[in-house]
Amino acid sequence: MEQTPKANRVHIGFFGRCNAGKSTLINMLTDQPVSLVSEVAGTTTDPVSKAMEILPLGPVVITDTAGIDDTSELGALRIEKSEEIIKKINLAVYVLRNDEAPTADDMMWLNKLKQNNVPIALFINEINASDSESAHNNDSNGNDTNLNYVDAYPDLSAIATVVGSTDFTSNRDRLTLLDLLGGLTPLDVEGEQSLLQGLVDPGDTIILVCPIDSAAPKGRLILPQVQTIREILDHKGLALVCQTEELPTMLSKLSQKPKLVITDSQAFEAVNALTPADIPLTSFSILMARFKGKLQDLVTGVKALNNLKPGARVLISEGCTHRRQCDDIGTVKIPMWLKKKGYTDLQLEFTSGGAFPKDVSGYDLIIHCGACMLTRREVLRRIDCAVVQGTPIVNYGVLIASLHGILERAISPFMDELDRKGFEC
């Protein structure tokens, strides 16, 4: 893995009316023609994303969205796509033109962002600005002469932070605007947390069991495995990697027992049998459940297995899109394990990527992947969506551990924090 995973970056969404200058601003900030720019309204259709670095924020993903007032034939669908972006971003940039007053649509969207607890940065596009103007021109009293627009509409500053104003067609203020944007505080950034928080100390040995089967990507490890190795290194620990069959050999060569064994969830049953009972064991998926979401809710959700009857509706949701293999964990192995444990005649439904139903009240159980490709904000939204609608939700690792009768062992490394939240296994 040579770049920061997309899910671990700060996600910044750009919003505003058609021809406000969103695409022009993005092209100026990235110094690349990321988005199509035209005087014709509605040139941005589906959201367009670009990964880059904005210091001191660090690695980010910026997303251009369709105009909020798109009245074209597909305008409603484009606006719906923009609304989906709100659920995934950590920071919003709202673009207004200095020659047009804010509209009711502008205020509605600004309030919509605020209601979703997304910090908002206002950028004012100075149409026909002179070359002498800059992002922050001050008069003799030190007042910002470019922000008179916002002064005229005080409702704006009550909702959003005014970052700056300039002519987006000019690159002269690019670095200034990048500095201003980089100094903002985004919402709920994953990078501020740790996948192995409280589990690894300097010098600790951690064994990672990484099965290589037909579903494994050729020539590389999967993202959770790579992220875990990096986390161990960051904590000055020792990362040892093997496949399931080599675990006994690796354990026999150690003079001291490892601090923790972490396995791919699909190998839980075999690794549990091979790992001595006095060595803590968990899985990459359960680590992700703790890192990305709410482990307590996901572990509580597994109790719904006791109530599954023939004909029950079960949603199995993947956060990424990949080609299904003959031993795919979501569409093949989990249904097989459920059937082996007596959960027969279930109505299984599947989603992948960004698809996730708004109404999940009709499901008896939601089984979600580890969500390594989704932002923490999106994972929390999905969990909250299920909890609010009274639908139990569990993730792959927790479910598989429960089906193999080892849930208590698999979550034992986290019992202190679960106990503090009043959890009962």
Where are these regions (language model features)?
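C-terminal end of P-loop GTPase domains and the immediately downstream helical coupling element
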Residues: T166-L233, L238-S255, I316-S317
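Switch II of P-loop NTPase G domains
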Residues: T43-S49, T65-I89, V95-L113, E190-L196, ...
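Conserved hydrophobic helix-helix packing surfaces used for dimerization/oligomerization
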Residues: I12, I206, A312-V314
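Conserved GTPase G-domain signal focused on the G5
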Residues: G21, S130-D131, D155, V162-D188, ...
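C-terminal effector/interaction modules appended to NTPase cores
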Residues: R17-S23, G219-C425
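Conserved G1/Walker A P-loop phosphate-binding module
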Residues: M1-A76, E84
